[in-house]
């Protein structure tokens, strides 16, 4: 093969018509929040650019990111993206297995040295030399370092790769760490969520492949276009929050009327994600629309912040756990009692000393 | 500025009691004190009700805006506190030397530590007579710095970091204070610390008010009226 295949070549080979291809380009432009003028540019890029292979590694994870990804709701994304992104290695989805699969990985790494994108689902456990996660007979941490070495950029899929998620929750016996603790010399795009929204995943990957650069990232390395606002900022129940109308109990009138879930622990005000705009399952719904508060699954350490039904973080102390208000009220009460006692002693002393005052 | 005046008691035959007064707190500083006091009360009350909202409002959402008003009051008072604090820092430079006491605790001076110890003993009822102070006593000065200055700066920084989340990315508050969120971990952690900070200031206010009242009664100088009129009055003319 004298020249590398373009995305367009691949799509045509997959039996996708030019009309469908152009529709896909328009949809992608819209999904990325770009103007109509960008649709032809995306089409042009896909017609001319050699496709970039993606190597998808699986560490310590539950595969919910893959499950979400393959349910991407764009009519064509399901068919196209999977073939388009030239997923040269994904041990869950690829047909090859065992030695053939590992051989495909090595071949792509060699052929596209410095050009491929590494997507990581899950994270490496560091304890016991990484033996808590073995891929192909070797600790995952070794595979991760090996593949990351020649990657152009790295995508951290989900909260596991981005923050650590449940396997890194206290007390984290396997010492699972997010991938940026291991890969320190490559640009990393974090796509947190447990799992991330399918359209967010395909949107990020399409952006990187078509424009050949990383999307604009925020301070924590998340794409601004999907993680720029909190769930709360775009929540359709927000008017009830501003009005002061809340669900107090799960079976009350407020719950039936669709009031704000703030008082039953909704983490929407502290969670950056696109759920309230993109929603899930072809834009059908998202947790708050279904009547349950956001649990903040795209936020760092969300497993360790106490109950999903409390707004305030649980603060661990000597075996008992309290939240900020309980601690504060207890301290204020103690200080109040101390003040009362001190005032009483002051008064007594003053009476005693009345005789010898000047 | 100091003033000495003699007051004759009753028929004036037994003794002449002298009261020396010193002008300590200048007008802008007194204004700042009471504005800050008011904004702390507003911030504490509204902040508590933002964290634990009042019972649900009846009627349609379009007819109510309770959380909106509470949050507006909180943010407005937050601006007043923060801008007032900046004004207070400015006043430390241009005001009299008492205006600097809040920020400059003379921990390098041995005598200051000795007086601090004396003050601790006074509060533990181990000293019979307190010392006279024109400005803060050492213990009061240390407490003002640790509780008020540190507390107010902490609450302003975390408060504006949370405010930036609502203003949105690349807003002025986000550019100035957005770095605070990842520093603490995530948004919820900043909320938790901001809550704890509120209780820190509640404790400060309780102790501050109690001791101001107590000192006003049992110490040898005026306290509360000083923050109203600016003059420190002394109740006796014995040395120190």
From Swiss-Prot, chain A:
Subcellular localization(s) per the UniProt record: Cell membrane
Cofactor(s) of this protein: [4Fe-4S] cluster; [3Fe-4S] cluster
GO cellular component terms listed in the entry, alphabetical order: [Ni-Fe] hydrogenase complex; ferredoxin hydrogenase complex; plasma membrane
Membrane disposition: Peripheral membrane protein
EC number: 1.12.99.6
Coarse class of the protein's main subcellular location: membrane
Family: Belongs to the [NiFe]/[NiFeSe] hydrogenase small subunit family.
Known role: This enzyme recycles the H(2) produced by nitrogenase to increase the production of ATP and to protect nitrogenase against inhibition or damage by O(2) under carbon- or phosphate-limited conditions.
Protein name: Uptake hydrogenase small subunit
Source organism (scientific name): Azotobacter vinelandii
From Swiss-Prot, chain B:
GO CC list: plasma membrane
Membrane topology type: Multi-pass membrane protein
InterPro entries linked: Cyt_b561_bac/Ni-Hgenase (IPR011577), Di-haem_cyt_TM (IPR016174), Hydrogenase_cytochrome (IPR051542), Ni-dep_Hydgase_cyt-B (IPR000516)
Principal subcellular localization: membrane
UniProt keyword terms in alphabetical order: Cell membrane, Electron transport, Heme, Iron, Membrane, Metal-binding, Transmembrane, Transmembrane helix, Transport
PROSITE patterns in the cross-refs: NI_HGENASE_CYTB_1 (PS00882), NI_HGENASE_CYTB_2 (PS00883)
MF-aspect GO terms: electron transfer activity; heme binding; iron ion binding
Highest taxon listed in the record's lineage: Bacteria
SUPFAM superfamilies xrefs: Transmembrane di-heme cytochromes
GO biological process: respiratory electron transport chain
Transmembrane portions of the chain: 31-51, 75-95, 142-163, 196-213
Similarity-based family: Belongs to the HupC/HyaC/HydC family.
NCBIfam families cross-referenced by the UniProt entry: CytB-hydogenase
Protein name: Probable Ni/Fe-hydrogenase B-type cytochrome subunit
Gene: hoxZ
